[in-house]
Amino acid sequence: MDSVEEPQKKVFKARKTMRASDRQQLDAVHRVKGELLRADGKLLNGSHENGDLDPTSPLENTDCIQDREEVNGIDGICFQSEESTTEWKETPCMPNVAVKNKQEDLNSEALSPSITCDLSSRVTTEPGSGSPASDNPGCGTPVSDNPASDNPASDNPASDNPDSGDLAAGELATTVQATGDSACEEPPSSDPSSSDPTSSEPSSSEPTCSEPISGDPVSEEAASHDLVSGDSTCSEPVSGEPVSHEAASSEPATSEPASDEPVARVVAACELAPGESALDDCAPSGDSQSDEPPSSEDSLPRSVCSGLASGELTPGELSVEPATDTVKPSSSAVCEAGPDPDKTEPSSNNSDDCPGKSEDDEHLDQIQSKDSCDEGNKVNSNVVEKEEPLETHSAIICSDLPPENTTKIAEDPIAEPALEEEAISSSMEVDQSEKDEHKSPAEPVAAVSEDPAEEDKEDTVVDNTDSMETDEIIPILEKLAPTEDELSCFSKASLLPVETSQDLEDKMEGSFGSPSKQESSENLPKEAFLVLSDEEDLSCGKDESEAVAQSKMSTPEGEKSEKDGKAEEEERVPAEEQPPVRNEFSRRKRSKSEDMDSVESKRRRYMDEEYEAEFQVKITAKGDINQKLQKVIQWLLQEKLCALQCAVFDKTLAELKTRVEKIECNKRHKAVLTELQAKIARLTKRFGAAKDDLKKRQESPPNPPISPGKPANDTNSNNNMTYRNAGTVRQLLESKRNVSEGPPPSFQTPVNTVSSASHATSTAVVSSQPKLQTSATSGSLPAAPLLPAPSTATVVATTQVPSGTPQPTISLQPLPVILHVPVAVTSQPQLLQSHPGTLVTNQPSGNVEFISVQSQPTVSGLTKNPVSLPPLPNPTKPNIPSVPSPSSIQRNSSTTAAPLGTTLAVQAVPTAHSIVQATRTSLPTVGPSGLYSSSSSRGPIQMKIPISTFSPPSSAEQNSSATPRIVTENQTNKTVDSSINKKAADSTSQSGKASSSDSSGVIDLTMDDEESGTTQDPKKISPPSSSTVSTSQPMSRPLQPILPAPPLQPSGVPTSGPSQATIHVLPTAPTTVNVTHRPVTQVTTRLPVPRAPANHQVVYTTLPAPTTQAPLRGTVMQAPAVRQVNPQNSVTVRVPQTTTYVVNNGLTLGSAGPQLTVHHRPPQVHNEPPRPLHPAPLPEAPQPQRLPPEAASTSLPQKPHLKLARVQSQNGIVLSWSVLEVDRSCATVDSYHLYAYHEEPSATVPSQWKKIGEVKALPLPMACTLTQFVSGSKYYFAVRAKDIYGRFGPFCDPQSTDVISSSQNS
């Protein structure tokens, strides 16, 4: 029992805490105190009435029960409201009592509400305890608790479940209804309900229980009892099992055992009497639930014995005990449930039915035996049962009460319910007590009868009961004062002046309506605490009070309600001592109380404050309660204060944390800003340096220009060197290969470029040009395909102006950089070179700004065409009709006008291909820009070399007529500005016209102007005449198949004649690479420079930077120089000399953008014989003598893509190669063979390709560095793979580089 008491205390603590959390309860209590006086009167009346009722015979009890039922019906209803308002409050306990009665009436509904309330109370109360959880859950475990009640589903639901929520109630209703249950309705029937309110409730409960078990009460009971018989199964099983569960729940281990035992007893008890068995069930359940199942059980056993005899006693006892223990709604539930089963039995005849019902027969037999004493006995046992639960409570409160039980059994049934209620008071106890009370009315009568029989057992029970009684009273008071529910429970069950207390309760409920809910959690816990603490004390106090005078008690208790509730725990022991005296009063009080309770339950529901008043009245029982309550309140206040202080502290701490975070955040921001500023400063310095570098480079290219007289190679080499040196860093960074070094005058270079271009499979389509140009230009055009375009976008085809001077070659290495090398070559190649200086700046964003440098003398102005090349800068310089390496380059040879009309398009394939469309039209007059087309008169040779993508400078001045815009289409990148394309197209069309007119062979450089006009109209207007280069001698040199038509080579102009200047633009550094032109005239950016038709080969080598290509900036400046093409030589510049755009696809897409080499080699002087194309055809691959059979399943090694880059520090060339896409079907590569080809003016033969080394295959991409080259020479490199079977794969597209240019450029 002590153990039970402790759990109760726990519950008390929980409630106390809740109450503390909600101060409203205290206020309500205070308000209630005001009403205490009134409550006192009512309590006195109620007490008296209770006393009367208590004595009343079972019949009267039945009346009370009926009354209660009615009241309960109302109560149930009220409680339902209350339940909703304060389902969890103690009031529910009262409602339970009421519910029991009502449940008899409503049974399920009433019980449900009241039980719900009760359970709610319990749950609130008990949950703290833990048992409550089980209890309420008992209730709560609806099945468990009420199930303990034997109404697991039903009663418990009704009673407990309500707690569980209305679910219980619903369940109850449902179960009860479902059960319909006579059990459900059993109250009436069971009440026989008359059996007793308790019984009736149990009835209702039982029905509920019954329901759970089965529709029919008897069956339920039987089943229940059976279950009970099952012991834990018993009523508990039915609902009883839940009880068991609850018991288990409450105190699973003991509970169950106890439960089982109680169950057995309960079975007996249930069978014995409706109320009793319900109680009994409850008891078992309660017992099991009870922390002191043993004790409880012991009591139960006694009770059970008695209870079995009386049938209900044990259940009641257990029930009460559990209730007390658990406070435990479980107990209460059990009690209720027990009664329910009993009631079911009552309905079916508590004893007989139960016995008939099931195994319970045994128990019934026992119960009947014990019960057999009579239903009165049952009632008694019910009472006893309740007492026992009370006893349990008492036990919980004090194990001492058992002795007193005997005497008080008769009373105790009533008192016990009251006590039980008190025990329940937390919610649970009240609930139980109310249930008990309901049972009690019947029980009391029966109890009285049984009292003697069961007195022995009940002595113990009585003690418990007494304590329970006190407990119940206290819980009632608590319910009244602390919690509406608790007060209501108290007042109803425990307070004799139930009516008064009920009024108070009603008031309280009304006043606490909302608070009650709030308080129900807070108050209930507090109440539970109070109840638990006070149960014994209150019981004692109340008993004393009752013995003395209820009014007296009521008033003092009312006054002390809150304090009492808190102090009750302490008083419990005294209360327990008093219970014997109180039992009688309790009984009477209970009978009336219950009766009144049913009425008051309703009121209480509405009146929260009244509950408190009632509670207070009860508390008054002890004088020291005030002090205790004060202490408790003080403690609560301290707790609250501490909580507030903690909250303030937390808030302050949070604010501080926020401030600290803000400060830290600011620090971080400052640090980041500082970092960014430092970075910006560094970048600014770099950009400044880059710009200076560009200026220097641009300035330097003009200086290098060699007099036109100089051999093209020298000039080219010088220019290339200069550019290369400037660009070498970029080259290194980008590991681009330089495009052909100083273009050898001979077309060989163009040829080589062509081959590479063809390899690139330039999409360039040269309209019939190729044949017209026999000169290397056609061969060079093939280079147009700028597969490696990734970088190729930067490729600018430099047109060599046939000026007789060396052709400048412009190598644009940086992919990102689109070099517009307007080769405005006056007769001197220098101009071209300086024009080549025009670079297309690539913005890192990937937009390529093409500065078209018009090589045409007329248009020297460079136009910047922003080309947005996402991945690669596509040089879309419409500017030069020079050969667009990837796209067809139209070169008009003097012989064919149409080819001139064609535009070269350099498209940068998304991968690496940039196709430069340069329309080279030698249209003398057509200048899209409105620049007058070059004077075709110049030389028929005038060739328009559209400098591919970049070179706005038409490759030759003659290119100006080509006005080919180099449209670099990034097919992959997709985008050269459409405007550029359009311009290119326009220029192309115009150039086409011009070329047709020029077809005589004269290509006007003016086309360049036109072109520049399209790209950059303003500058294009440079002297047209100079631009004219006679393309009459087209080199029919076949373009590499890939290369679209070869640019027309002026028929008379041999490439060799003009020196070829190569400009290498390396995009490595963001700075722009200056393309050095050696224009005779200074290169003015954007200046239309009359181009002396010099045969300059402009070789644009775009080496894709291995890394992102740094866009070249400041490219424009050179363009003017290029532009300045002065037709120095009356000789028409034979730009037409075949300009070869060598687009090297050697770069693998994966690696840095492929380098695009556009060799535009216009024939030097028209008279010069066409140069041989370079490089010579690659050597044939030897076939292995014999292949192993497995080789048949594999294909030849893939064709590598080669990229060249210059090593600035040493005169070295870096060869890097990879494959565009890995072909899994190829055999494993064993080694790579490197071949080099030194370009010489002499004839080209395959034997000139020398194998320079063999490298064991490693994972691609691979690279190797070659050194020790003869400066001033142009080298071509090719790589092919050899697989493990000795088979050779195809050569990569040959890539060329000008060794000299790097030395010069430095």
UniProtKB/Swiss-Prot annotation:
InterPro entries: ATF7-int, ATF7IP_BD, Fn3_ATF7IP, FN3_dom, FN3_sf, Ig-like_fold. The modification Phosphothreonine is found at residue 124. The keyword Nucleus applies. There is a cross-link at residues 33, 592, 944, 974 (Glycyl lysine isopeptide (Lys-Gly) (interchain with G-Cter in SUMO2)). One of its GO terms (molecular function) is ATP hydrolysis activity. Residues 666-696 form a coiled coil. A motif (Nuclear localization signal) lies at residues 587-605. Residues 109-134, 143-162, 513-523, 713-722, 948-981 have a biased composition (Polar residues). Recruiter that couples transcriptional factors to general transcription apparatus and thereby modulates transcription regulation and chromatin formation. Can both act as an activator or a repressor depending on the context. Required for HUSH-mediated heterochromatin formation and gene silencing. Mediates MBD1-dependent transcriptional repression, probably by recruiting complexes containing SETDB1. Stabilizes SETDB1, is required to stimulate histone methyltransferase activity of SETDB1 and facilitates the conversion of dimethylated to trimethylated H3 'Lys-9' (H3K9me3). PANTHER family: ACTIVATING TRANSCRIPTION FACTOR 7 INTERACTING PROTEIN, ACTIVATING TRANSCRIPTION FACTOR 7-INTERACTING PROTEIN 1. Its main location: nucleus. Residues 596-851 are annotated as: Interaction with SETDB1. Belongs to the MCAF family. Residues 1190-1306 are annotated as: Interaction with MBD1. This is Activating transcription factor 7-interacting protein 1. It comes from Mus musculus. Residues 1054-1143, 1196-1302 form the Fibronectin type-III domain. PROSITE patterns: FN3. Residues 1001-1011 are annotated as: Interaction with SUMO. The modification N-acetylmethionine is found at residue 1.
